[in-house]
């Protein structure tokens, strides 16, 4: 799986959340579920993938650009949110 991300957003994500966007590749490889992000019109289809890694839940938001998964953000999420997604 090929990924890409914006270097400025990577720096911001590390500063704000302590997680590099490259970690999204791990989340995508271990994802237990994905849902389309329909909260608003982003001008592109965005997916939210989530995975449990070392007892913690993470989310990776990405969009497909050709065959490349372009990572938009990566962050921790709580188990309550995961259960809500799995019940859909």
Give residue spans per PLM region:
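Ribonuclease/tRNase effector modules and their secretory precursors
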Residues: 1-88
């Amino acid at each position: 799986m090929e990924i890409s991300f914006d270097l400025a957003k990577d720096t911001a994500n590390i500063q704000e959340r302590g997680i590099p966007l490259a970690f999204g590749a791990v989340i995508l490889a271990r994802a237990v579920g994905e849902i389309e992000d329909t909260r608003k019109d982003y001008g592109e289809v965005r997916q939210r993938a989530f995975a449990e890694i070392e007892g913690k839940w993470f989310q990776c938001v990405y969009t497909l650009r050709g065959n490349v998964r372009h990572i938009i953000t990566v962050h921790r999420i709580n188990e309550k949110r995961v259960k809500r997604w799995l019940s859909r």
